[in-house]
């Protein structure tokens, strides 16, 4: 490296002191289109061993278009210093052009000989052949032993069950958008799965049920990650070794392999993320031919992939941000190109709005439309949604139902919180434990329909039965003082000055009394928030609040999950803060009163925009509410890049078939080192260029690849990693894998570039001509051998645990935190 640095300084001195002055001449007339492509490098030619830039042969009849008022550089400057415009009709990979004789006569005589094996046609054939081998190897590793183990592994219990729900058209709730589960259900349906397997818990055997279609679909999409990464790096770096090294890192990573072999959302998500990244890079590379068929194809495919990524998980927002930043940079450069009219810039802006905003948005909304249309039967997710939403679900108690319109004394009702994913006012015979306020009956909110959700509304000062036929019907009105008696336990809704179980400065809410007899702390004043229906309380439509008469607090739910003594239901409190919030607003859902006439609820069904909005509100609240349970394993974001601890997919004992999600440590630690090296080398080069240091022409192409292509990948890694530090929800190891894809691609580009720089610096010596090939080959062999050592983690293992000395995996437990 010292020798390389010496050569660099010598070349710089030669360029600075002895370069002949530039010839001057008249500027060429005519309109010029100067195309600057953000994050993209024009195609250079390099010596495959030394990394030195070479010049292709010069066709005699080709003219060059120069910047206004500038002439070609001196002969010694090389192509890196010329201001050439690619001929219209060619994409950037074919855009390198030579200088014609009438502009620079000496150029034709200055041809650099290139080996026959590195000709463009042979090189392209080698790229395609390698891509075919990479693709076959990727599919072979992902489909190998796909049927093992023949039982549920980890989150297959969730996403396999949700695939069954789609086949059975049963409505359910999940914190993720529906596309991934829809595709899993479709794959199961097309492969003969009938949707009858229960997917109850990990370890349950599939028996005669067809599960290979769903696993095969996920493995199919996971297998395309490697070819996509290969093509992305090849386009960013124009380097076959960099692309091959990237493909090897991902092919031989046990973590990516494991995630791709099971019924999970991760391979589907990563497929769309990588497809979006590849499409973005491809349409950037065709930016010299705007509005052509390939340009439109890749731009549209980028938008489709963005819709797919967001339709699987909200993590897809990160790749949307990356494409958005690239688009802003692209448009900014086009806007600064004075050779382009504002009409042309407007066309570019319109094309990107159509393909990157309108098209993904239409597809995303269509995904939800199909989701709502297919899932039309009542299921376990009903309680997460509003009463009006439930009225559209076949089999729900509100579907095609007829109930009394106005609330009256003596009615049996359910009271539902207006905030999404809070549920129904609920009580049961269990008491609050010692030390948690008064030891009285628990009152909670519960997300599912249950007989313990039923309450009887009564006057505060009367114990007579309002349903007695001899008594006239009396409607409940705004401002009335009432009691709510729990139908199952006959205890009254009650509050007092004891502190709530979880929320400070809120009061405890309990069930109190015997057979409806209690005290003045059972009295509540009912207030109608939206009084456009009058003073009467309308079922489903009226929004009400319950004000405690003694303490003056308002009944609400904090949304916090109670410990096991509260059956992990949600806390109900009486808050002294009387500000109107959705947590303290309720509506009457079910209403039973034989003395009142019924009306149909069909008119209350929501429109599709209302369904779409409510679905997202419920998903967001559900995502934020994912908290770790007692003794549940979680991980922290700083654990992930260092491969600190894996995740047990299947089995725990030495007699079990064990699958352990853990990244290949050689790959992951190499990625981590590469990120650090990139930050150091990239910063050094950027500072040097900013200070005006002129690099030799042979190095300018390499530094552009490192800064532009590597910078794009570093941005992708940061966008898919750092946001997790800000999330309050429960996190798992598998959340890092989209970021890991970007770090692996960055590793391929970085090491290829560094080895080429070493080869250039050591070029006179025999080592200089071999160091690049030897370095790349060493990395490939090391990665392949590490996969040979760690492949049982992905394909399964039986026998003693790694902690046991006699275990064949004992020597591979490099960290104490690895539990396989």
Curated annotation (Swiss-Prot):
<comment type="pathway">
    <text>Protein modification; protein glycosylation.</text>
</comment>
<dbReference type="GO" id="GO:0005829">
    <property type="term" value="C:cytosol"/>
</dbReference>
<feature type="transmembrane region" description="Helical">
    <location>
        <begin position="301"/>
        <end position="321"/>
    </location>
</feature>
<feature type="transmembrane region" description="Helical">
    <location>
        <begin position="735"/>
        <end position="755"/>
    </location>
</feature>
<dbReference type="Pfam" id="PF16192">
    <property type="entry name" value="PMT_4TMC"/>
</dbReference>
<feature type="glycosylation site" description="N-linked (GlcNAc...) asparagine">
    <location>
        <position position="376"/>
    </location>
</feature>
<dbReference type="GO" id="GO:0021542">
    <property type="term" value="P:dentate gyrus development"/>
</dbReference>
<dbReference type="InterPro" id="IPR032421">
    <property type="entry name" value="PMT_4TMC"/>
</dbReference>
<feature type="transmembrane region" description="Helical">
    <location>
        <begin position="713"/>
        <end position="733"/>
    </location>
</feature>
<dbReference type="Pfam" id="PF02815">
    <property type="entry name" value="MIR"/>
</dbReference>
<feature type="transmembrane region" description="Helical">
    <location>
        <begin position="774"/>
        <end position="794"/>
    </location>
</feature>
<feature type="transmembrane region" description="Helical">
    <location>
        <begin position="659"/>
        <end position="679"/>
    </location>
</feature>
<dbReference type="GO" id="GO:0005730">
    <property type="term" value="C:nucleolus"/>
</dbReference>
<feature type="glycosylation site" description="N-linked (GlcNAc...) asparagine">
    <location>
        <position position="168"/>
    </location>
</feature>
<dbReference type="InterPro" id="IPR027005">
    <property type="entry name" value="GlyclTrfase_39-like"/>
</dbReference>
<keyword id="KW-0812">Transmembrane</keyword>
<comment type="function">
    <text>Transfers mannosyl residues to the hydroxyl group of serine or threonine residues. Coexpression of both POMT1 and POMT2 is necessary for enzyme activity, expression of either POMT1 or POMT2 alone is insufficient. Essentially dedicated to O-mannosylation of alpha-DAG1 and few other proteins but not of cadherins and protocaherins.</text>
</comment>
<feature type="glycosylation site" description="N-linked (GlcNAc...) asparagine">
    <location>
        <position position="515"/>
    </location>
</feature>
<keyword id="KW-0328">Glycosyltransferase</keyword>
<dbReference type="GO" id="GO:0031502">
    <property type="term" value="C:dolichyl-phosphate-mannose-protein mannosyltransferase complex"/>
</dbReference>
<keyword id="KW-0472">Membrane</keyword>
<feature type="glycosylation site" description="N-linked (GlcNAc...) asparagine">
    <location>
        <position position="653"/>
    </location>
</feature>
<feature type="transmembrane region" description="Helical">
    <location>
        <begin position="353"/>
        <end position="373"/>
    </location>
</feature>
<keyword id="KW-0677">Repeat</keyword>
<comment type="similarity">
    <text>Belongs to the glycosyltransferase 39 family.</text>
</comment>
<feature type="transmembrane region" description="Helical">
    <location>
        <begin position="261"/>
        <end position="281"/>
    </location>
</feature>
<dbReference type="InterPro" id="IPR036300">
    <property type="entry name" value="MIR_dom_sf"/>
</dbReference>
<dbReference type="GO" id="GO:0035269">
    <property type="term" value="P:protein O-linked mannosylation"/>
</dbReference>
<feature type="glycosylation site" description="N-linked (GlcNAc...) asparagine">
    <location>
        <position position="400"/>
    </location>
</feature>
<feature type="transmembrane region" description="Helical">
    <location>
        <begin position="124"/>
        <end position="144"/>
    </location>
</feature>
<dbReference type="GO" id="GO:0150103">
    <property type="term" value="P:reactive gliosis"/>
</dbReference>
<keyword id="KW-0325">Glycoprotein</keyword>
<feature type="domain" description="MIR 1">
    <location>
        <begin position="404"/>
        <end position="460"/>
    </location>
</feature>
<dbReference type="InterPro" id="IPR003342">
    <property type="entry name" value="Glyco_trans_39/83"/>
</dbReference>
<dbReference type="GO" id="GO:0071711">
    <property type="term" value="P:basement membrane organization"/>
</dbReference>
<dbReference type="GO" id="GO:0004169">
    <property type="term" value="F:dolichyl-phosphate-mannose-protein mannosyltransferase activity"/>
</dbReference>
<keyword id="KW-1133">Transmembrane helix</keyword>
<keyword id="KW-0256">Endoplasmic reticulum</keyword>
<feature type="domain" description="MIR 3">
    <location>
        <begin position="534"/>
        <end position="591"/>
    </location>
</feature>
<dbReference type="Pfam" id="PF02366">
    <property type="entry name" value="PMT"/>
</dbReference>
<protein>
    <recommendedName>
        <fullName>Protein O-mannosyl-transferase 2</fullName>
        <ecNumber>2.4.1.109</ecNumber>
    </recommendedName>
</protein>
<feature type="transmembrane region" description="Helical">
    <location>
        <begin position="216"/>
        <end position="236"/>
    </location>
</feature>
């Amino acid at each position: 490296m010292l020798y390389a640095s010496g050569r660099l300084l010598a070349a710089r001195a030669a360029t600075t002191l002895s370069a002949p002055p530039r010839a001057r001449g008249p500027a060429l007339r005519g309109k010029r289109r100067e195309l600057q492509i953000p994050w993209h490098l024009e195609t250079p030619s390099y010596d495959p061993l030394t990394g030195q830039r070479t010049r292709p042969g010069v066709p005699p009849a080709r003219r060059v278009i120069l910047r206004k008022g500038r002439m070609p550089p001196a002969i010694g400057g090389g192509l890196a210093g010329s201001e050439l415009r690619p001929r219209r009709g060619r994409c950037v990979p074919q855009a390198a052009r030579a200088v014609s004789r009438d502009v620079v006569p000496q150029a034709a005589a200055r041809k650099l000989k290139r080996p026959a094996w590195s000709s463009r046609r042979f090189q392209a054939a080698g790229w395609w052949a390698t891509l075919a081998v990479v693709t076959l190897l990727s599919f072979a590793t992902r489909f190998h032993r796909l049927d093992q183990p023949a039982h549920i592994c980890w989150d297959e219990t969730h996403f396999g069950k949700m695939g069954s729900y789609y086949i059975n058209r049963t409505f359910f709730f999940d914190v993720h958008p529906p596309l991934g589960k829809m595709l899993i259900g479709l794959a199961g349906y097309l492969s003969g799965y009938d949707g009858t397997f229960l997917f109850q818990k990990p370890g349950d055997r599939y028996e005669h049920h067809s599960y290979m279609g769903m696993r095969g679909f996920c493995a199919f999409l996971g297998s395309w990650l490697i070819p996509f990464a290969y093509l992305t790096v090849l386009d960013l770096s124009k380097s076959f070794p960099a692309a091959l090294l990237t493909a090897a890192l991902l092919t031989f990573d046990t973590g990516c392999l494991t995630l791709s072999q099971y019924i999970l959302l991760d391979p589907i998500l990563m497929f769309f993320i990588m497809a979006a990244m590849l499409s973005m890079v491809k349409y950037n590379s065709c930016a010299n031919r705007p509005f052509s068929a390939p340009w439109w194809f890749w731009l549209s495919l980028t938008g489709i992939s963005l819709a797919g990524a967001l339709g699987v998980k909200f993590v897809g927002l990160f790749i949307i941000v990356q494409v958005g930043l690239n688009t802003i940079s692209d448009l900014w450069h086009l806007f600064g190109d004075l050779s382009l009219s504002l009409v042309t810039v407007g066309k570019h802006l319109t094309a990107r709005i159509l393909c990157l905003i309108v098209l993904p948005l239409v597809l995303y909304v269509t995904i939800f439309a199909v989701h709502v249309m297919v899932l039309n039967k009542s299921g376990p997710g009903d309680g997460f949604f509003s009463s009006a939403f439930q009225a559209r679900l076949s089999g729900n108690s509100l579907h095609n139902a007829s109930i009394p319109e106005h609330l009256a004394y003596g009615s049996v009702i359910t009271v539902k919180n207006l905030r999404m994913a809070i549920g129904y006012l609920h009580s049961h015979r269990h008491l609050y434990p010692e030390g948690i306020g008064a030891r009285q009956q628990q009152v909670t909110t519960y997300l599912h329909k249950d007989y313990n959700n039923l309450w009887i509304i009564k006057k505060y000062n009367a114990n007579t039965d309002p349903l007695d036929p001899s008594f006239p019907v009396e409607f409940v009105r705004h401002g009335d003082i009432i009691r709510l008696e729990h139908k199952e336990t006959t205890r009254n809704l009650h509050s007092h000055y004891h502190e709530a179980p979880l929320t400070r400065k809120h009061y405890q809410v309990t069930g109190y009394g015997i057979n409806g007899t209690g005290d003045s702390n059972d009295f509540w004043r009912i207030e109608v928030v939206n009084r456009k229906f009058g003073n009467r309380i309308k079922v489903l439509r009226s929004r009400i609040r319950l004000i405690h008469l003694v303490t003056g607090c308002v009944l609400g739910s904090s949304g916090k999950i109670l410990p096991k003594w509260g059956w992990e239901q949600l806390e109900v409190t009486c808050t002294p803060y009387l500000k109107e919030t959705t947590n303290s607003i309720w509506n009457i859902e079910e209403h039973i009163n034989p003395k009142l006439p019924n009306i149909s609820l069909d008119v209350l069904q929501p429109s599709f925009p209302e369904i779409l909005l409510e679905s997202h509100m419920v998903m967001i609240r559900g995502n934020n509410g994912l908290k770790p349970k007692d003794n549940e394993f979680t991980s922290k974001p700083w654990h992930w890049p260092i491969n600190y601890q894996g995740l047990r997919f299947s089995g725990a004992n030495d007699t079990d078939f064990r699958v352990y999600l853990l990244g290949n440590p050689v790959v992951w630690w190499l990625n981590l080192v590469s990120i650090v090296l990139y930050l150091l080398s990239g910063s050094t080069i950027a500072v040097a260029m900013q200070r005006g240091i002129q690099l030799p022409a042979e190095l300018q192409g390499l530094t552009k690849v490192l800064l532009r292509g590597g910078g794009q990948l570093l941005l992708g890694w940061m966008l898919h990693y750092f946001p997790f530090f800000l999330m309050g929800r429960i996190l798992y190891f598998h959340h890092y894998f989209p970021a890991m894809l970007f770090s692996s691609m960055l590793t391929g580009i970085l090491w290829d570039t560094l080895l080429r720089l070493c080869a250039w610096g050591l070029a006179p010596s025999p080592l200089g001509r071999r160091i690049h090939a030897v370095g790349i080959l060493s990395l490939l062999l090391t990665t392949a051998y590490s996969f040979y050592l760690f492949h049982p983690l992905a394909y399964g293992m039986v026998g003693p645990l790694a902690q046991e000395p006699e275990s064949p995996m004992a020597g591979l437990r490099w960290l104490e935190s690895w539990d396989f």
